[in-house]
């Protein structure tokens, strides 16, 4: 696969992987060719829902050549780090989850925390980190889910029981403001 296979492909949102998360796949090559944000869903054939969902945030790559012809290669954004969590084309879930506490841009974190929607081999520490983020950033996460009209994501958030009374009221107000009767 060439390095430019997804060049100028800005509408790609999901990669559906027709395999289990334990299997070796071509996901490493795919996400390595995409610098924009993309979600990968491990959704085996014949199953009603994905077994695992992963988010690969966007990142930027800069290559600068100095007068001495030394190349300075820098990466901005956590997306590059997430794309390195593979060994022999198999996902390394512990390494993937260890990146989350290192910080993200505001938009990425609200999506990353929703990994609890399709968890796979989460350690207790990783689960707690995602839950803690959701508890303290419910409004931000709900705003993103409402904007995307992701009713299933909102149901998942409610089922995680991370919203206190104030957060629930804030969510209802956001849903009403977004004119989303189903979410309200």
Please place each PLM-identified region on the residue numbering.
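Solvent-exposed loop and capping/linker segments of extracellular ligand-binding repeat ectodomains
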Residues: 1-184
């Amino acid at each position: 696969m060439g390095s430019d296979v997804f060049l100028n492909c800005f509408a790609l949102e999901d990669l559906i992987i027709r395999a289990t998360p334990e299997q070796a796949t071509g996901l490493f090559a795919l996400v390595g060719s995409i610098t924009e944000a993309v979600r990968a869903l491990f959704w085996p054939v014949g199953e009603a829902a994905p077994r695992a969902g992963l988010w690969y945030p966007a990142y930027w790559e800069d290559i600068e050549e100095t007068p001495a012809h030394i190349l300075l290669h820098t990466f901005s954004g956590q997306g590059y780090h997430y794309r390195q969590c593979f060994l022999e084309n198999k996902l390394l879930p512990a390494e993937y989850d260890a990146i989350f506490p290192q910080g993200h841009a505001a938009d990425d974190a609200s999506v990353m925390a929703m990994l609890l929607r399709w968890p796979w081999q989460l350690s207790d520490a990783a689960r707690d980190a995602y839950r803690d983020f959701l508890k303290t950033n419910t409004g931000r996460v709900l705003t993103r889910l409402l904007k995307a009209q992701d009713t299933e994501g909102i149901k998942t958030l409610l089922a995680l029981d991370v919203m206190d009374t104030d957060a629930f009221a804030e969510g209802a107000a956001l849903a009403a403001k977004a004119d989303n009767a189903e979410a309200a």
